[in-house]
């Protein structure tokens, strides 16, 4: 009896090691990431659609906050930093101000923020998507323009969130090819 119990324990431990090894290898090489990418972007777009009309009607300005130079940074060598900084910008500066516009907006923005945090976490786990240190001048310009717009900045930034999602998608597509 003790021999068969020992054998069962050894088999159990071996099975646990194998399953742990497979999980960590899969996590490290990011083989699962491409499959979930389009789903994550769809979730972001769906969550944004819950507040898009509200912010579009409040955005009375003709200027564009998220310009082509930002998209160029996303597509260039600063893509990683631009993405990281823009996620942080929306989570720390834009969304907290946007949440002040009522409990129904706050609820949807919380959901949108959680989805953005999940995306950032997944990108960080897969180092080829977010291995960066340099600063993006385009992101600095977005932040500067946002601050100059004062109270209107939140409407402009949230109204253009779909442009930000498109930038994320362009960046991830480039990284998938490399």
Swiss-Prot record:
GO terms for molecular function: cytokine activity; interleukin-10 receptor binding; protein dimerization activity. This is Interleukin-10. It comes from Mus musculus. Disulfide bonds join 30-126, 80-132. Major immune regulatory cytokine that acts on many cells of the immune system where it has profound anti-inflammatory functions, limiting excessive tissue disruption caused by inflammation. Mechanistically, IL10 binds to its heterotetrameric receptor comprising IL10RA and IL10RB leading to JAK1 and STAT2-mediated phosphorylation of STAT3. In turn, STAT3 translocates to the nucleus where it drives expression of anti-inflammatory mediators. SMART domains: IL10. Glycans are attached at residues 29, 134. It holds the Pfam family IL10.
């Amino acid at each position: 009896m003790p021999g068969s119990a020992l054998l069962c324990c050894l088999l159990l431990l071996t099975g646990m090691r194998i399953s742990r090894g497979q999980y960590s290898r899969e996590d490290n090489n990011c083989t699962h990431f491409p499959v979930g990418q389009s789903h994550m972007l769809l979730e972001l777009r769906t969550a944004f659609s819950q507040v898009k009309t509200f912010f579009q009607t409040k955005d009375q300005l003709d200027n564009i906050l998220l310009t082509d130079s930002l998209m160029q940074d996303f597509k260039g060598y600063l893509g990683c930093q631009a993405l990281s900084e823009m996620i942080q910008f929306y989570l720390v500066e834009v969304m907290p101000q946007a949440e002040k516009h009522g409990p129904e907006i706050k609820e949807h923005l919380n959901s949108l923020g959680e989805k953005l945090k999940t995306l950032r976490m997944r990108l960080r786990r897969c180092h080829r998507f977010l291995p960066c240190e340099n600063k993006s001048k385009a992101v600095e310009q977005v932040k500067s323009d946002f601050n100059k717009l004062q109270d209107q900045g939140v409407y402009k930034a949230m109204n253009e969130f779909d442009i930000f999602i498109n930038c994320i998608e362009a960046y991830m597509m480039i990284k998938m090819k490399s």
